[in-house]
Amino acid sequence: MAKYTEEQLLELKSEAHTPKPEILDAFNKLIEEVKESIEQHQQHQRKWHNGDTYIDEHGHERSYHHINRRRQSKGASGVPRPNLRKKSEPVVDEDGWATLSKPKKGSFAEGDAIEERIKFRETNNSGAGIKARPNNKNLGSSKAVDPREIASDKQTKAFNAFAALGDEDDDDEDDE
């Protein structure tokens, strides 16, 4: 492919023939957009890389912007944490199809626990039910409340301010 300088291209522009000017206009528009994006990138570089750098312990030039950021978790420092979950294992059937089976979780119904479960159900179905005692220390008292006790908590005699003013003579006698 031949290489031309800008001057040679400008000289050949008058002789050039473009069959579809829309394509040339779209190409020129694309070139302008690329120039704008390059200029924006350079402005961003000037803003963030304005000489505020230092040489770290490994000899790399670094900016100061990373210093105030939060640190990554310990697992993200390059050493992956072990995955403790059980991975699903592919099971291949006789047709050659491989399916992933999820690992079974331990449940109450596994193994010998089935017998215990049946015994527990039989004792509950007998109709007696399970007797549970509430923890009265944390709950209110379970004793029945007598309505007379509730009435005794009420204030039986209302305070009368006028009667108290009239009794000033009685209080003076007590003070002497």
Swiss-Prot record:
GO terms for molecular function: eukaryotic initiation factor 4E binding; translation initiation factor activity. Residues 37-155 are annotated as: Disordered. Keywords: Cytoplasm, Initiation factor, Phosphoprotein, Protein biosynthesis, Protein synthesis inhibitor, Translation regulation. Pfam families: CAF20. One of its GO terms (biological process) is negative regulation of translation. Residues 55-64, 145-155 have a biased composition (Basic and acidic residues). It is found in: Cytoplasm. Its main location: cytoplasm. Acts as an inhibitor of cap-dependent translation. Competes with eIF4G1 and EAP1 for binding to eIF4E and interferes with the formation of the eIF4F complex, inhibiting translation and stabilizing mRNA. This is Cap-associated protein CAF20. It comes from Candida albicans (strain SC5314 / ATCC MYA-2876) (Yeast). The lineage of its organism: Eukaryota, Fungi, Dikarya, Ascomycota, Saccharomycotina.
